[in-house]
Design a protein with these regions (language model features):
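Histidine-acidic metal/acid-base catalytic patches
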Residues: 1-9, 17, 21-33, 56, ...
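Active-site beta-loop-alpha junctions enriched in small/polar residues
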Residues: 11-15, 38-42, 71-74, 106-108, ...
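Short, well-structured secondary-structure segments
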Residues: 33-39, 65-69, 101-103
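Glycine-rich, proline-tolerant flexible connector loops at the mouths of alpha/beta enzymes
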Residues: 36-60, 107-113
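Hydrophobic alpha-helical membrane-association signature
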Residues: 51, 85, 121-124, 262, ...
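Short, basic/glycine-rich phosphate-binding loops at helix/coil junctions
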Residues: 65-70, 138, 208-209
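The substrate-binding groove and active-site-proximal loops of carbohydrate-active enzymes
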Residues: 72-80, 216-220
Length: 276
């Protein structure tokens, strides 16, 4: 069962060494029925060539729902190659039973000019909309707070989505780490389809120097105000899942039992903190 009114999900990045069936078992052992699978885990689904139909069977047997496949990278750097990649990934997502495809922007310091940001974003969304809609998928646009990213602000994503009349297809990912880095005050709970949660507990790293490698499970030392962000989203009407997405090596080195215990502790802290 879910913990109270808080819906949790697990991104496969929480335990990238676990095979799909093991990962789904981890989720089920925690009472979590929603997961995200990824296309960037070496030796694992999807890079190991597992057919989408096999994923669908494994997921159904586990009794869980795949809320997203994460991710189409550099989606706003549109090209014929990106279109082919998007179609292939969307086909896989639909055939595996996933509900959505996460869309990650270019993050290399290119395409960051104000005018080109909007133009690149709208052209990509316009091209992606029929690809996703025809397969019954949502597109989850995930701004990244890094200073070199071509899409840092959710407000820019919403503006572009509205410009292409894409609100029926596209939602936002509110990532608590990237929201903190971007320094954006505005929340868009009614436009948000998924929330990624992770913490930073290193007291020495400056916000501008925070990277994925600093992202751990949320604990009492969290510097990102995860509880404040989540409470604000919930108070404004967000009722969707909170998906754990830590990238730090000290999380990835945990064995299945250790990561389960750590997740259980983090879930309890978050649930208590946001429902108090």
């Amino acid at each position: 069962m879910e913990r109270g009114a808080v819906l949790f999900a697990l991104n496969h990045m929480v335990a990238p060494k676990l095979r799909l069936a093991e990962f789904l078992a981890l989720a089920s052992s925690l009472g979590i029925s929603r997961v995200e699978i990824r296309n960037d885990l070496s030796g694992n689904v999807l890079l190991d060539g597992t057919p989408a139909a096999d994923v669908a069977i494994t997921v159904k047997q586990a009794g869980v729902e795949v809320v997203s496949i994460n991710a189409l990278q550099r989606f706003n750097d549109w090209s014929l190659a990106r279109e082919r990649e998007a179609i292939e990934l969307a086909d896989y997502a639909a055939e595996s039973g996933a509900k959505a495809l996460v869309l990650v922007p270019r993050n290399d310091g290119q395409g960051c000019g104000e005018s080109e940001r909007h133009a690149n974003l709208t052209s990509a969304l316009k091209a992606l909309a029929p690809i996703l809609a025809s397969r019954g998928l949502a597109g989850l646009v995930e701004p990244l707070g890094f200073e070199i990213c071509s899409l840092r602000l959710k407000s820019e994503a919403v503006k572009a989505i509205d410009a292409v009349q894409g609100a029926d297809v596209f939602k936002l990912v509110h990532d608590t780490f990237h929201h903190h880095l971007a320094g954006e005050a505005a929340l868009f709970p009614d436009r948000t389809g998924l929330v990624h949660i992770s913490g930073v507990d290193d007291p020495t790293v400056a916000v501008s120097d925070m990277r994925d490698s600093h992202r751990v499970l949320i604990d009492a030392s969290d510097r990102l105000d995860n509880l404040g962000q989540i409470k604000a989203l919930r108070a404004a009407g967000y009722t969707g899942p909170l998906s754990f997405e830590p990238f730090a090596d000290n999380v990835h080195k945990l064995d299945a039992a250790q990561v389960r215990d750590s997740l259980a502790a983090s879930m309890a802290l978050v649930a208590a903190g946001v429902t108090a």
